[in-house]
């Protein structure tokens, strides 16, 4: 048993005790700033340092001037001595051992970066600028270039930044603790492009697994998982016109057609490796431009350790994944997209986080970012941890991340994942597995406040940026303003549309008359939210099959069904979203392990489908009636709603001052002639799109390009040819 130090054994070496030396050597000292920095005595300045492995140490100014030799006071690397300085300033140590020599800029000779005002803003929950106010960023301090590291770990006994620059030795860069906020900080020179993590001694003295930086702007390529020091972006942005356009318009009245992309499997290089951001810029952006999409939405491109998670289990919310290059590359991609008028959206995951040991879970030895009680802090569906939205530091971390992507990378919006799981305390839980809110209800009030604040700040500080909720329940006012009691999202995914329409089109046509309501019911709520119609990645994975595989009938009918479905969707009120590969009817289910089946485009039916999607986009964008009232009931009117027997649907899309567009769907393989549709406007109507056209792989049936609407007994209509399993669109010529 180690006996206590007596007064003789407690004697000081200079003004440092043996106990303090041993505490630093063993990694147990929590504040070396008290004893290691330069200190002033009546005789002048003295220096003290701990450099393991050194046998000799001399002291230099940052200009390289020699100011003194230090004496070894402990064989494990402690040195101390008088130096010739007239004022306090940062110094550099030159260490020697045998024939080796190396330099160490003393991190303890710098003052703090954060001050009382920073502490105040952190405590009161300031949002704007929080991430750049104390995140690890490059800066110049006291004339020296370096990085400011800071991390929130209020329950840690000792926190160090470790990395390539100090041989991952947690005794070398022990951070300064700011007790009012729980933040630890240190300024470290000579750490450019270095891998690093935080070494944390927990509240009970236990050494925790090394933690990646929650605010890191760059990470290592998996399977490595350290953070990497990164400079500020130097991108020269050329997207002012694009951003000004979206800031000035009502997004609800603009054409929005989103191409959903998994960056790692859209295309691969010949050797099977990922495309870089520059390669994606050169290939994906021109493809989307040609296809007529207005936006690219990426599945999460934030850093994540596990490819099959598709990015939805992220450990680095501030870092674009290293799979496709550095953050500058992603900035170039966004700039390139904006230059040709294409917006970039990011799937964003504030609902939960993975339990990888280098991540946020049990960050400082306590449940810091998550709830301690698994009834609140563990997600049974995904085996992940749930953020504690009631902690102001957690809320600030997430909200600043949303602002960060808009500010630093000029993103056009965030599609917020798994919103339903955030809103309900009993989501995927049985009785007894959840804790009611303060009023005894199942609503997660802390999450509601978080979402409202996030949306208010995004829209308030970045006009033109949109937020989209993936929300699958009937929670009211998801896309209504916060001041009207809503959650404040700009748009919401219409999961009901997706479910009902896929169910309908998978049925054999002979049975469809019994399920007519699957295509009409959605109009009862189509304008209660600002909807996006999503045919997303979720519908083509986990054994669900691709969209073409879901369609009923033989191969010809499958293609005809999918073409008519796309026509139905592009004519239906709501913004559009289509997952990659479905535009050319890929047969196989999507997998993140390889590229899409681009070879299918050599076959006419697949290439015809692609041409149809392109023409649908171009028609949707060029015809205001198809988009300007996507979210308002006065832009839609049924023409034929109850023809169950023939499975025919027709409606009129309108916009003020614009020509109306009639959408007619014949969803059986029966070719119909002289089918009457009440169009409401007399004169010639032009057929502007026909999904049965031969160029799309159809039979070529149609109306010869035009029909004549006449007044017959007070009702204006036309006798139409309805191609089999097809959607046509008509527009009056005058």
Curated annotation (Swiss-Prot):
Keywords: Carbohydrate metabolism, Glycogen biosynthesis, Glycogen metabolism, Glycosyltransferase, Transferase
GO biological process: glycogen biosynthetic process
Catalytic activity, as annotated: Transfers a segment of a (1->4)-alpha-D-glucan chain to a primary hydroxy group in a similar glucan chain
Pathway named in the protein's UniProt entry: Glycan biosynthesis; glycogen biosynthesis
Keyword hit for Transferase: yes
An MF annotation (GO) of this entry: hydrolase activity, hydrolyzing O-glycosyl compounds
Enzyme class, spelled out: transferase
A GO CC annotation given for this chain: cytosol
Pfam families: Alpha-amylase (PF00128), Alpha-amylase_C (PF02806), CBM_48 (PF02922), GlgB_N (PF22019)
Superkingdom per UniProt: Bacteria
Residues annotated as the enzyme's active site: 417, 470
The EC number(s) this enzyme carries: 2.4.1.18
Family recorded in the similarity comment: Belongs to the glycosyl hydrolase 13 family. GlgB subfamily.
Stated role: Catalyzes the formation of the alpha-1,6-glucosidic linkages in glycogen by scission of a 1,4-alpha-linked oligosaccharide from growing alpha-1,4-glucan chains and the subsequent attachment of the oligosaccharide to the alpha-1,6 position.
PANTHER family: 1,4-ALPHA-GLUCAN-BRANCHING ENZYME
Subunit record text: Monomer.
This protein's name: 1,4-alpha-glucan branching enzyme GlgB
Organism listed in the record: Rhizobium radiobacter
